[in-house]
Amino acid sequence: IITHKLNPCVGYSRNNNLLVELAEHDIVSYLQSDMVISSNYDVDVLSELEDNCILSATRIEPPLHGESSQTITKDFGTDPNEFKWDEFQSYSITAKQARNIEYFFAPFTFYKKVWMDVGGYDTLFRRSREDSDLLQRFIQKGVKIKQTFKANVYHFSCVTSRGKNWFDPNSEEAKQRVQTQNRADQIELMRFIRKWGNFNHGERKLDRYDMDLVWKTGTIEKLAQFEFYFNRVWLPTQEIKDQLLALHKTDHSFANQLLKFTDKDWENAKQFYNQIDYNEIYQVGEPEGYNIKVEIDNTSLDTFLSGIASLSAILEEAEPGTYELGDVRINVENKVNLAETQITVTNPPFDHSLLTIE
């Protein structure tokens, strides 16, 4: 049993990284706290595990998210105190199938080396998107992604992350928590796009081209809608830079609220989390040299914004030259794909004296 002295919590990403780091055996199997394994779960996952592979088991879930090809929808309860244990165990045996798909989600099993080689979860992500980031790094590195229907668990579905009864439309507390989580998730999504240039959950490798945005005029509110697609953002004045920096001062407030961090708690704990250096991203003036430069000068952005999520795909076929996307100019000197530089994450070192191992 491992406990900690860091108030109020270690955090999801760090917690799982420590789980793997401190594991004494070569194979690690991870379950979330709102999951119940089926009979012979260990035998089932070990029979499907391969080298250089992340193996997910299949989730059996109550009908809260709708049907999907990765899960089995069957209601055995949404409250652990009312869980139909015997019925689930009987059903779980009949639900097992000798088939696999390519998908990644908890619960998962893997060789410890596979996890350690990419650095585990990126502590940049505090409330969501850490799985998608880890999956993208596995794909970039060539790790096999596999989900088996031979092993399954019952998943109470987001009770851990969203709270008990998060789905209850009559609970004001639950609705408020979901709203706060949604706002936190939007911040995490912007962090993901800033890192990878776009978002997906492992459907394909992402290309992260090195790009500079030159913003000559326009509102801060408009700029904030898309500047996270770029590695550096060049601004006309220090005043505008200061305004952008001020927008990010509350980035962690929603995660802190959900995780019950006080301001003092966060000041003590933030040293253990990766964070974005916005002072390096936001620059005043224009770049002297660049690989790809996007210039925006008081133009209509409708066409550009509708196509920005496809910008990496557009650039994939582009030769050096000048292009237009709507009224926006795109200058391509070189195409430098930074995706491979994101594969291995380095998290700040953790103070192991904060842990008690029994």
Across the structure, where does each feature detected by a protein language model lie?
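Acidic donor-binding/catalytic loop of UDP-sugar-dependent glycosyltransferases
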Residues: D34-E48, K293-A309
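A short, conserved alpha-helix in the catalytic core of glycosyltransferases
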Residues: E102-G119, L124-N152
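Glycine-rich, basic loop-to-helix element that forms the pyrophosphate-binding segment
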Residues: L6-A23, K270-Y273
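Short aromatic/hydrophobic "clamp" motif used to bind/position activated sugar donors
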Residues: V28
